Regions:
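Juxtacatalytic substrate-recognition/specificity segment
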Residues: 57, 84-87, 105-204, 208-217, ...
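The feature captures the short pre-catalytic strand/loop hairpin that immediately precedes
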Residues: 254-269
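Short helix/loop segments within enzyme catalytic domains
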Residues: 232-254, 295-299
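Amphipathic alpha-helical substructures
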Residues: 158, 240-241, 272-338
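Active-site rim elements
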Residues: 37-48, 130-138, 215, 266-273, ...
Length: 338
């Protein structure tokens, strides 16, 4: 019973999005950025208490539409009453705010990904409403290259046992695990990629595989995902263009408040532009402080060591790892920059 909460400003204000495609068909999504999962499903809505053994999700929706959710599709049934049901299994830990539903008359677009060493053959799915299929097909051609570049820095995409998918959403975007929401304009920037698409896909490592236990450390998820955009420029266009991109990010830093504002914060208290753009600049500065060899070793280990991967982390975890790898105590750096 009851009536689902409507998202008044998705994805920043949580709830369901009831929209229509240009032809008038239903186009439905749900967002729960930060605190918000419990707006529509029963959970202890805190990042430190995620379903660490995955979850099962079942959707029932009008026949003729496509119903998508997180994880791997394990069953699809025509109920014979004008509805259909899809069942999904999430095989990894998943944070509460990453659980989602998408319903529309979607068209499936696919590219194949062969891995950073050529040993994989994985489908990369893009589910798009029909009116935008032509634009989506053009944009989606970049996705194998995006995954290869990010994979060389962070390790292979971390959820292939479920799937890799992006879904066209009736709102700007969100890093929903294995079914990333994209609602921008299918337009590349002057560095040759779509900022939103790359940022949200980078969250599959930074936010989904690696999740903060306290929203006070929100900058780890958003700062690393933003810095991933700069690393993509570095690895595809070189150091000079990387510096140009970092200069562009620098324009968004206003030093209005600390990046880490305390402990035991809500996502609303922790959220600001600083966690994105100054967070990325903290990582850029750290790269120059400890050097490329140690810096990229830290990044790789933070994303892949069993003590962090598919688990919960903090700023202190990152600081300790930096000290271990570099052999330097740089408490002054964290105090000054965060």
């Amino acid at each position: 019973g009851g009536k689902p909460k409507v998202a008044l400003r998705p994805p920043w204000i949580n709830g369901f999005v009831w929209s229509e495609t240009p032809s008038g068909a239903p186009w439905i999504g749900v967002t729960g950025q930060g605190d918000g999962g419990d707006n529509w499903w029963p959970c202890k809505d805190h990042p430190s208490d995620e379903p660490d053994e995955g979850m099962d999700i079942s959707l029932t929706f009008p026949s003729g539409l496509v119903g998508l959710s997180n994880g791997r599709l394990i069953n699809e049934v025509d109920n014979g009453d004008g509805t259909a049901t899809t069942a999904w299994r999430v095989n990894y830990p998943i944070n509460n705010y990453l659980v989602t539903v998408n319903i529309a008359p979607y068209v499936r677009i696919e590219e194949r990904y062969h891995g950073i060493d050529g040993t994989l053959d994985e489908p990369l799915e893009f589910w798009v409403v029909p009116e935008y299929e032509q634009y989506a097909r053009t944009m989606w051609r970049q996705m194998p290259r995006v995954l290869e570049v990010l994979g060389r820095r962070f390790g292979e995409y971390p959820f292939f046992d479920d799937k890799f998918a992006v879904v066209h959403a009736p709102y700007y975007g969100m890093e929903h695990q294995t079914v990333v929401a994209y609602g921008a304009l299918f337009t590349d920037n002057d560095f040759g990629f779509d900022d939103l698409l790359l940022h949200e896909v980078a969250h599959e490592w930074w936010g989904n595989k690696i999740t903060v236990a306290d929203w006070a450390d929100f900058w780890i998820q958003e700062g690393f995902a933003t810095y991933a955009q700069a690393l993509y420029v570095l690895d595809t266009l070189g150091e000079s263009r990387y510096l140009d991109y970092m200069a562009r990010l620098r324009q968004r830093v206003d030093h209005s408040h600390p990046v880490v504002q305390g402990k035991n914060l809500t996502s609303v208290q922790a959220y600001s532009d600083e966690i994105y753009f100054k967070g990325a600049w903290v990582l850029h500065s750290l790269r120059w402080l400890i050097g490329d060899e140690d810096f990229f070793s830290v990044v790789w280990r933070f994303a892949n060591d069993p003590g962090y991967a598919y688990g919960l982390v903090s700023t202190q975890d990152l600081a300790m790892l930096v000290s271990e790898v570099s052999g330097r105590e740089i408490d002054w750096f964290w105090e000054r920059y965060l």
